Amino acid sequence: MPMADHPATPAVVLAGGLAQRMGGGDKPLREIAGRSLLARVIDRLAPQCDTLALNANGDPARFAGFGLPVIADPVDGFPGPLAGVLAGLDWIAAHRPDAEWMLSAPADCPFLPSDLVVRLHQARLDQQADIAVAASAGRSHPVIALWPCRLQIDLRRALLADDIRKVDRFTARYPRAIVEWPVQPFDPFFNANTPEDVAEAERIALRDSR
């Protein structure tokens, strides 16, 4: 499926986590090879998505340099990535009511594949799925997913009424397509959770730029 053939797809970049394994602070602003994690994620997604928004809590001014709308969790208490997905769906309903699909991706995955959106769309069509989820090395990455915007109301109910916090618990309610990517020369869904991961991301970025 050529990129122009799939529906226009906005994306929400999830940066609402507490970065506890990184010692707190704004993990998306950590630099690898002279460029922040968030900037690298934007670089990867901008050619694939027609609109980007950033889900982050706290003072939005710290992300002003990226030129993205910053949207906070609509649910109190840092309830996890599902709240960020809901924030994205709420924002799209208000600002892109024409959109039928939304991509979600975390702000700490700097090597997202260039065919992410097109392959997720193809898989959900081929498998008649409601949600398409990325995977690598036999493991799914539930926050890197293609969501139908019509799940906005269901997701709000799951968070507020059913107290569901884990992404897999919510997505298990719907037909899912799991889309596997190769991990050579590196895992495109490598995420920088710890200082050691950041060091490894530096090595990958330098190798990838040669």
UniProtKB/Swiss-Prot annotation:
Gene Ontology molecular functions:
GTP binding; metal ion binding; molybdenum cofactor guanylyltransferase activity
Q: Where's it mainly located? A: cytoplasm
Coiled-coil stretches are none
**Chain sites annotated for binding Mg(2+):** D108
Keyword GTP-binding, does the record have it? yes
Q: What is its EC number?
A: 2.7.7.77
Fill in the domain comment: The N-terminal domain determines nucleotide recognition and specific binding, while the C-terminal domain determines the specific binding to the target protein.
**Known function:** Transfers a GMP moiety from GTP to Mo-molybdopterin (Mo-MPT) cofactor (Moco or molybdenum cofactor) to form Mo-molybdopterin guanine dinucleotide (Mo-MGD) cofactor.
- Please describe the quaternary structure of this protein: Monomer.
Q: What protein family does this chain belong to?
A: Belongs to the MobA family.
What name does this protein carry? Molybdenum cofactor guanylyltransferase
Classification lineage: Bacteria, Pseudomonadati, Pseudomonadota, Alphaproteobacteria, Hyphomicrobiales
